[in-house]
Regions:
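N-terminal pre-domain/capping segments
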Residues: 1-91, 161, 188, 200, ...
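Acidic-and-aromatic substrate-binding clefts and catalytic sites of carbohydrate-active enzymes
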Residues: 8-15, 31-43, 67-68, 106-109, ...
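H/E-rich (His + Asp/Glu) clusters that bind or coordinate divalent metals
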Residues: 214-219, 226, 231-232
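Acidic/histidine-rich catalytic cores of soluble enzymes
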Residues: 13, 23, 58, 123-213, ...
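Hydrophobic faces of well-ordered beta-strands that scaffold small-molecule active sites
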Residues: 2-7, 30-32, 55-60, 98-100, ...
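Active-site acidic/histidine proton-transfer and metal-coordination neighborhood
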Residues: 50, 69-165, 175
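Generic structural signal for well-ordered alpha-helices
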Residues: 19, 41-45, 83-88, 119-126, ...
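Residue-level preference for long, well-ordered alpha-helices that form the structural scaffold
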Residues: 72-79, 111-114, 118, 182, ...
Length: 260
């Protein structure tokens, strides 16, 4: 397995600086956000190549502000336009996965409507993902939908496409489940993984990976049992007074976890 981290947590301002620090700190991969222009995408691609960093995935940028489940067609259209930009970013930089939050339940949007509207929208772009062999990966997150492993598996399977998959976040499920259970149920559907720290006792994220209540040995056993061998991408601040110190602490924690 490779070690990854999300772009914004790294020290530096320019892509080449952040990617260089990633390598110095022991990370193989860096996940990046949606890039809006082809010029920017080419810039990131060159910076990654020059520093030896792999960009495995794109975090879609507008799925909270413009959810695919919104009742307003113009909001859904904005979300879909951003998803197309995310796909274009993946193609330009060589990533094979786009992370999305598929739907958001709100006081105005019921569970059933969020499910059906989001699937109807996303099914229109699935052929583009299939044609380009890019995974559209559904993340488990606090969106009040897909709150159990079978539910998430069914949502993914409804697309009947090998390129609609799971982007599993180990920390996000702690308030309502056990990540090792989710991993075993989702199995080969998982194409990418986020890791972060979380304490079930305080119901809050932790700044480091190891001080919370996640059973990392059980998680790592489940990961190996389902045959996952891609990147683990850290999505947390880390511990320290500078971005360098924080990322160094994350990298060291990840080394310990990978040995479990």
């Amino acid at each position: 397995m490779q070690k990854g981290i999300y772009y914004s947590f790294l020290p530096g301002e320019k892509p080449e600086d952040k990617f260089s620090w990633a390598r110095t700190l022991g990370f193989d991969c860096v996940e990046i956000p949606t890039l809006r222009t082809q010029e920017e995408r080419e810039y990131f691609k060159l910076a990654a190549e020059n520093t030896g960093v792999r960009i495995p995935s794109i975090m879609n940028s507008d799925h909270w502000g413009a959810p695919f489940s919104a009742p307003e067609p113009e909001v859904r259209a904005k979300g879909m336009a951003c998803l197309q930009q995310s796909l274009d970013t993946a193609l330009a930089v060589g990533a094979d996965t786009v992370l999305i939050v598929p739907a958001v339940v709100t006081p105005q949007v019921r569970f059933e409507d969020a499910w059906t509207r989001s699937q109807a929208e996303l099914k229109t772009i699935v052929p583009e993902f299939e044609k380009n062999k890019i995974y559209m990966a559904i993340e488990d997150v606090g969106n009040k939908i897909l709150l159990s492993p079978p539910e998430m598996a069914r949502y993914i399977d409804d697309f009947a496409s090998p390129y609609v998959a799971a982007y599993f976040d180990v920390g996000n499920v702690i308030p309502y489940g056990y990540p090792e259970h989710w991993i075993l149920t989702l199995g080969s559907r998982i194409k990418k993984m986020h890791i972060k720290g979380y304490s079930a006792k305080t119901r809050t994220s932790t700044p480091d990976l190891l001080s919370g209540t996640i059973d990392w040995p059980a998680v790592m056993k489940a990961i190996r049992d389902v045959g996952y061998d891609d990147v683990l991408t850290a999505e947390l601040r880390g511990v320290g007074n500078t971005a360098y110190d924080c990322c160094k602490s994350i990298s060291e924690d990840m080394d310990k976890i990978l040995e479990m």
